[in-house]
Amino acid sequence: MRSSCWLAALVVLGACGADDDAPPGDGDGGADVDAAAGTIDAPPVVGEPPGLEGIVNAHNAERALVGVGPLTWDPALAAIADAWVRQCVDNQAPTGLVDHNAGRSNGYPTYVGENIYGSGGQASGTGATASWVSEKQYYHHDTNSCDAGRVCGHYTQVVWRNTTKIGCAIYTCAGFQYGSTVVCDYGPGGNIGGQSPY
């Protein structure tokens, strides 16, 4: 008898876990992905600085579309990105955009990947992610290749299957053509030669 009562109680409690009438993502515990729109309805991520709100969820929406697991915010990666972007280094070309940080993996337990986005206006985390994801139109998963003359590496880093963590920073570098800059660092980093992102 006691076993039956406990079983009945568990069944009733289990049925109360989600509100079937609630709109997707409305407190039912999970993030909902609209595959057609490439959007995700999820709670904000703790740790994202002002101006970057939604960047992790934007990444995870795109990752869900290709069947790879979500990223989590990593304060250590965010600190690496923040320390770099605040230096406003543009020596490699110069291009009016912050250079990549060649030393970004120093002191971190894995190789660190990096995406950089710059805007002549005001950059945002979701705008940066949308720019990187826009490269997917040039990427061909079946041959793991990119159209000639096009860039796909930002997109492939966003969806890299072995990457599990992300940390980003936003800063405005005065005098740069694309001064409002978002830097995202990823661990473990992607774009490993000869490997497919997913």
Model-predicted regions and their roles:
Residues 1-14:
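Sec-dependent bacterial lipoprotein signal peptides
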Residues 13-48:
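Ser/Thr-rich, Pro/Gly/Ala-heavy low-complexity intrinsically disordered linkers and tails
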Residues 56, 60, 82-86, 117, ...:
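Non-transmembrane alpha-helical segments in soluble domains
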Residues 71, 116, 158:
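Short clusters of hydrophobic/aromatic residues that line enzyme substrate/ligand-binding pockets
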Residues 103-119, 124-129:
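A solvent-exposed, acidic/Ser-Thr-rich amphipathic alpha-helical stretch
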Residues 120-198:
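Disulfide-stabilized extracellular recognition modules
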